[in-house]
């Protein structure tokens, strides 16, 4: 165990264009090598593509996509006696959102396509429609937790 104090949670400021904390969180997940303005430009472009394709406000669609990709349970490794068990645990809200955003960005990067904005827009639309790689990943995590339900009594 670490002897140091835990770092306090930093509050996430809302982004300037949409006034949404979720958008800021997604910009930060997209960002590579500290290039926040580039990440913001990519996300805003992706949201414009979403608006163009669906003909509706992209913010509720983004919230819906994140909600659909958020896992409710996950498995954590727990050593008991010489064996390591995959113990299902509930996911706290903030971690669930963080995982969903991470999966959306990761699977957007692996998608075939021309620009990152287009790939992200496609992944968001797919997640909002409950398809796509991020949703598949959530289902996989849920299946793992369901399969290891027998070890739930080892919970932390």
Curated annotation (Swiss-Prot):
State the Pfam families in the record: Ribosomal_S7
GO CC list? small ribosomal subunit
Q: Does the keyword tRNA-binding apply?
A: yes
A single GO BP term for this record reads: translation
Question: Does the entry feature the keyword rRNA-binding, yes or no?
Answer: yes
MF GO annotations: rRNA binding; structural constituent of ribosome; tRNA binding
Q: List the disulfide bonds.
A: none
Q: Which UniProt keywords apply?
A: Ribonucleoprotein, Ribosomal protein, RNA-binding, rRNA-binding, tRNA-binding
Question: What's the subunit arrangement here?
Answer: Part of the 30S ribosomal subunit. Contacts proteins S9 and S11.
Similarity comment: family membership: Belongs to the universal ribosomal protein uS7 family.
Q: Which NCBIfam families match?
A: rpsG_bact
Q: What does this protein do?
A: One of the primary rRNA binding proteins, it binds directly to 16S rRNA where it nucleates assembly of the head domain of the 30S subunit. Is located at the subunit interface close to the decoding center, probably blocks exit of the E-site tRNA.
Name of the protein this chain belongs to: Small ribosomal subunit protein uS7
């Amino acid at each position: 165990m670490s002897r140091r104090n835990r770092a306090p949670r930093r509050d996430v400021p809302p982004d300037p264009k949409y006034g949404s904390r979720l958008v800021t969180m997604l910009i930060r997940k997209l960002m590579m090598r500290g290039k926040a303005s580039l990440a913001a430009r990519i996300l805003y472009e992706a949201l414009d593509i979403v608006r163009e394709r669906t003909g509706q406000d992209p913010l509720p669609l983004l919230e819906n996509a994140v909600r659909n990709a958020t896992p409710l349970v996950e498995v954590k490794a727990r050593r008991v006696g010489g064996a390591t068990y995959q113990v299902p645990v509930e996911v706290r809200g903030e971690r669930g959102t963080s995982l969903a955003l991470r999966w959306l960005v990761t699977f957007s990067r692996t998608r075939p396509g021309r620009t990152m904005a287009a790939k992200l827009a496609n992944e968001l639309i797919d997640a909002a429609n409950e398809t796509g790689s991020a949703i598949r990943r959530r289902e996989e995590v849920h299946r793992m937790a369901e399969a290891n339900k027998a070890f739930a009594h080892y919970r932390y």
